[in-house]
């Protein structure tokens, strides 16, 4: 009976780990058709206007200067000119389809992550008792560790999060989150987040050492500073 009670929180923790993946798989299959139909029927006209006025024009302006393109067209025979215009038309349609699929992909991933967050929040709320048991296990495990191992673990964690090489890890993590939500890659936003998060975490960590660790385990703070130096 005791083993069964101990197994329930472990099963609950395992379900929390794998539940987001299962929700994402089910939502992607069930929502993709509905979102695609809704986007193509309700948003098609607005989307095409946006693409024609911005993305398509910007792409072709970058590919070929308008003046050089005009001079090249004047030298073309009528048959080649028709083929040239047909090629531009096909490329424009293909470009619009790609951006249309990208918008659908963005909405699908954002909706899936939002649904996953709501379900996990409710799942965690109704399983507060099991989370309390898991928390007590973690606290007991940490309490049984020696101060040296605790200090080494804290130092390793802080070096990973706010150390010299941490911006590369933050860049990969934030980039993955952007991709998971279906957002485009913006270098300025990414650089701002990468340069801000480690500073905020460093400040919080120093405050935590000053207010919490100094009070409950002064020896741990001494060992940590000795290893860090």
UniProtKB/Swiss-Prot annotation:
Pfam families, alphabetized: CemA (PF03040)
Catalytic reaction annotation: K(+)(in) + H(+)(out) = K(+)(out) + H(+)(in)
UniProt-listed GO biological process terms: potassium ion transport
Cellular location(s): Plastid, Chloroplast inner membrane
Membrane topology: Multi-pass membrane protein
Domain of life: Eukaryota
GO molecular function: antiporter activity; proton transmembrane transporter activity
Function comment: Contributes to K(+)/H(+) antiport activity by supporting proton efflux to control proton extrusion and homeostasis in chloroplasts in a light-dependent manner to modulate photosynthesis. Prevents excessive induction of non-photochemical quenching (NPQ) under continuous-light conditions. Indirectly promotes efficient inorganic carbon uptake into chloroplasts.
Entry-linked HAMAP family: CemA_PxcA
PANTHER family cross-referenced by the UniProt entry: CHLOROPLAST ENVELOPE MEMBRANE PROTEIN, CHLOROPLAST ENVELOPE MEMBRANE PROTEIN-RELATED
Annotated protein name in UniProt: Potassium/proton antiporter CemA
């Amino acid at each position: 009976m005791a083993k069964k009670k101990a197994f329930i929180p472990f099963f609950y923790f395992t379900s929390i780990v794998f539940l987001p993946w299962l929700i994402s798989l089910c939502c992607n299959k069930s929502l993709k058709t509905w979102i695609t139909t809704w986007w193509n029927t309700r948003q098609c006209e607005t989307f095409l206007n946006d693409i024609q006025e911005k993305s398509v024009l910007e792409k072709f302006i970058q590919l070929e200067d308008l003046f050089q393109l005009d001079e090249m067209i004047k030298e073309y025979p009528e048959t080649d000119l028709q083929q040239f215009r047909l090629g531009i038309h096909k490329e424009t349609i293909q470009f619009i389809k790609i951006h249309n699929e990208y918008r659908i992909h963005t909405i699908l991933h954002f909706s899936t992550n939002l649904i996953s967050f709501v379900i996990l929040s409710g799942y965690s709320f109704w399983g507060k008792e099991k989370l309390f048991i898991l928390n007590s296990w973690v606290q007991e495990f940490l309490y049984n560790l020696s101060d040296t191992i605790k200090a080494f673990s804290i130092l390793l964690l802080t070096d990973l999060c706010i150390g010299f090489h941490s911006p590369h890890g933050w860049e990969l993590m934030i980039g993955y989150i952007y991709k998971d939500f279906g957002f485009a890659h913006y270098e300025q936003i990414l650089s701002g987040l990468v340069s801000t998060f480690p500073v905020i975490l460093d400040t919080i960590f120093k405050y935590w050492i000053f207010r919490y660790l100094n009070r409950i385990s002064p020896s741990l703070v001494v060992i940590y500073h000795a290893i860090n130096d």
